[in-house]
Curated annotation (Swiss-Prot):
Its EC number is 1.13.11.18. Disruption phenotype: Embryonic lethality at the early heart stage, due to defects in endosperm development. It is an enzyme of class 1 (oxidoreductase). This is Persulfide dioxygenase ETHE1 homolog, mitochondrial. It comes from Arabidopsis thaliana (Mouse-ear cress).
Length: 294
């Protein structure tokens, strides 16, 4: 009798729904699921009926996130990469090949100072790939973006929002609004907003005043359930929301003058890669082959 009762209890427990988070997000039906790789190198956000394929990839040395997005409902499965790193290009291309995707764009949120972008290397390995960055960055690329521009892969598009402050040319890429676009929306914020933080403003024409205005006018005005995916994380986080950062970000929740004081007193060390990364990234990550990055 005890065994029968135990077996029945076990059966009931197995039938209970499992939740990945104690804070459910308002999601359209059918609800997307967030899966974390056992190796911690990639994540996916999709649903059984969604046309979006999404992967969050991580480069350990610079703590950089690279994002892969594709429209898998399109016959060609067009894809783009946001903030690729030179050291992980082969990993990214292997994944793209395994998933049967066609890489169209290699995009940067800004000219990075802590790693060399993978866009130039991607172009040499896949000559049809177009490098993309903001016009305000002043760097080389195939396509230059301005605020309000849209980058499309199949029926999915990213809206370009200017978010300078960490550097003069920073942009945030935001997935489109409307029932035909992935919901909730996703914001790829570069270094403008980090999870419970933000990028430094003491080099590359940075401005704490400008960063504060950018975040509050271009990111914090998005729906509160918009998912925030930053370019870096140093504390083991993967994703946040606009609502979370508006409530809990220890810097950006302050008034502007307090924020500027915080930023001016960070006393951060000189970035160890800046003298290599910035010159390389100004020519699409290929100092020795500038003709590949025009």
């Amino acid at each position: 009798m005890v065994m029968t009762h135990f077996s029945r209890l076990r059966q009931l427990l197995l039938l209970q729904p499992k939740f990945l988070s104690s804070q459910p997000r308002p999601l359209r039906s059918p609800p997307p699921t967030f899966l974390r790789s056992v190796m911690g190198s990639s994540s996916s956000f999709s649903s059984s009926s969604s046309k979006l394929l999404f992967r969050q990839l991580f480069e350990n040395e610079s703590s950089t996130f690279t994002y892969l997005l594709a429209d898998v409902s399109h016959p060609d499965k067009p894809a783009l990469l946001i903030d690729p790193v030179d050291k992980t290009v082969d990993r990214d291309l292997k994944l793209i090949d395994e998933l049967g995707l066609k890489l169209i764009y290699a995009m940067n949120t800004h000219v990075h100072a802590d790693h060399v972008t993978g866009t130039g290397l991607l172009k040499t390995k896949l000559p049809g790939v177009k490098s993309v960055i903001s016009k305000a960055s002043g760097s080389k690329a195939d396509l230059f973006l301005e605020p309000g521009d849209k980058v499309s892969i199949g029926d999915i598009y990213l809206e370009v929002r200017a978010t300078p402050g960490h550097t003069a040319g920073c942009v945030t890429y935001v997935t489109g609004e409307g029932a035909d676009q992935p919901q909730p929306r996703m914001a790829f914020t570069g270094d403008a907003v980090l999870i419970r933080g933000c990028g430094r403003t003491d080099f590359q024409e940075g401005s704490s005043d400008q960063l504060y205005e950018s975040v509050h006018s271009q990111i914090f005005t998005l729906p509160k359930d918009t998912l925030i995916y930053p370019a870096h994380d140093y504390k083991g986080f993967e994703v946040s929301t606009v609502g979370e950062e508006m409530q809990h970000n220890p810097r950006l929740t302050k008034d502007k003058e307090t924020f500027k004081t915080i930023m001016s007193n960070l006393n951060l060390s000189y970035p160890k890669m800046i003298d290599v990364a910035v010159p390389a990234n100004m020519v699409c990550g290929l100092q020795d082959v500038p003709s590949q990055a025009n």
